[in-house]
Each structure stands twice: as C-alpha cells, then as structure tokens.
C-alpha cells in the first residue's frame, strides 16, 4: 500500500511540474501561426533578460502612426551562440523583422528573424529550425 501511495504522490508531483513547463513553452498558447508578418522599423530597446529576450521595434504605418512591436526571442545564451553580442543590435538602428503576432495583440509577437535594414539578406538572428541551419548559424539544429 505504501508503494502505491508513493508512486501516486510521485506521479502527481511530476504532473505538477511538467504541465506548467509545457504550457510555458507552448507557442500556440500566446502566438498565432496564421498571423505571420514582415515589417521594417527602428529598434527602441533590446532586453537581455532570462528566460527570453525581447526586442522592441517602432513601426510607422502609412498614416504616420507608430506601433511598438514587443518581440520575444529565445534566451540570451541561444542568441550568443548565433553570434550576437550586446552591441550587435542597438536602439536607433533600422531593421527588417519577421514574426508571428500574438493571439490578442499582433504587436506582441514571436520573432522569427531580424536583420539590419542595410543588409536585409544577412539576418542577425533566425529562430531555430531549418532556416537557421540553412543560414549557417552556429548552434542551430
């Protein structure tokens, strides 16, 4: 009886740890794969925070309205393995970026790639997967 109880407690404990981890890392809990976009804008801030970095980019539409896109990236460690340093992307720089918009707010998104406007075909960052491997980024799988 003690063994069964111990197994049940261990299973419940494992579930309590795994469920939040899966929910936290689930792309579709916050972002919409049907809201892919590509914009150009000016970097407002680069936040080197764990567990995920953020890049804020000001995008000006045709009417002159400025929207700040709050884009999530992977961890600082992962972007450093792709060759980023703290001076790779600075506030005030013009960029071209692609991402997926948020389910509630498109301007809070998941960053797919970002490049400086004067070198749009040389991204500084590509979010994992085949694109990163194809671009030859260190640490890409």
Where are these regions (language model features)?
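Short aromatic-glycine-enriched beta-strand elements
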Residues: 49-59
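OB-fold/S1-family single-stranded nucleic acid-binding modules
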Residues: 102-128
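Bacterial N-terminal signal peptides that target proteins for export
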Residues: 1-10
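Short nucleic-acid-contacting surface segments enriched for D/E, G, S/T with interspersed K/R
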Residues: 81-97
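Short, structured beta-strand/loop micro-motifs enriched in basic residues and often containing a Trp
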Residues: 73-81
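Bacterial N-terminal signal peptides
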Residues: 9-18
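Conserved hydrophobic positions within beta-strands
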Residues: 39-43
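Short boundary/loop segments of OB/S1/cold-shock single-stranded nucleic-acid-binding domains
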Residues: 23-37
